[in-house]
From Swiss-Prot:
CDD domains: THZ_kinase (cd01170). ATP binds at R125, T145. The keyword DNA repair does not apply. Keywords: ATP-binding, Kinase, Magnesium, Metal-binding, Nucleotide-binding, Thiamine biosynthesis, Transferase. Substrate binds at M50, G172. Its EC number is 2.7.1.50. Belongs to the Thz kinase family. It comes from the Bacteria. It catalyses: 5-(2-hydroxyethyl)-4-methylthiazole + ATP = 4-methyl-5-(2-phosphooxyethyl)-thiazole + ADP + H(+). It comes from Agrobacterium fabrum (strain C58 / ATCC 33970). This is Probable hydroxyethylthiazole kinase. The gene is thiM. The lineage of its organism: Bacteria, Pseudomonadati, Pseudomonadota, Alphaproteobacteria, Hyphomicrobiales. One of its GO terms (biological process) is thiamine diphosphate biosynthetic process. Catalyzes the phosphorylation of the hydroxyl group of 4-methyl-5-beta-hydroxyethylthiazole (THZ).
Amino acid sequence: MSGDFPTAARAAEILERVRQMRPRVHCLMNTVVQKFTADGITVIGGIPSMTTSLEEIESFVTKADALTVNLGTLDAERRRVIRLAIEIANASGKPWIVDPVHVDYSPSRLDFARELIAQSPTIVRGNRAEMSLIGDVPDVVRIETGPVDHLRDRTRNVSIVNGHPWMAKVTGTGCLSGGVIAAFMAVEKDALTAAASALAVTGVSAELAAQRAKGPGTFEPAFLDALSEISGEDIINHARIEHEQG
């Protein structure tokens, strides 16, 4: 991993690369938020796909540039698809992120998350309760989300101090952010920088959206508008990326 710390200028540059390169992101996503996540990836510049068909997953992951795996809705068939998708991503060297949603609610889900994390994801992302159960994961970028997002790898600790409280009142903003992280990973090999940049972009977009929204109901479409319209200047002027040596 690179030893450089992410910056607002770097985030703006990576966003421009996403818009120019239009990476394909395959999403094994919580069914509740599939459309919102797909919309977020699309407006930021990526191309999402969402199939969970066991017969199709190999083809879709092979054609994707990155994979995002969310454990929000699980059943036996979904577990088989996730295992195969990760096997294909690893075999082809594609970056992937796993979000161990609600592992604090279900021991079997926690066991499954640990099984997946043993397959060496690029990034593991969850809230404080989830990540406290996951623990340290060597050689993986670890993201703990909250009002301030904390990221770390072996040598760097970074915090993203952007966002808005309405993000917590709209179902799926975190899942959408995971999709945006995957799009950024597809064009930036430094996974911590990619993730920090993606979270800065989504956080600044949320702040800009809140300026024109009246509440959570109008915030959701305003957030998508802001993601679509955010400029490099917006990121440089408003991103708050804090870091210290690990």
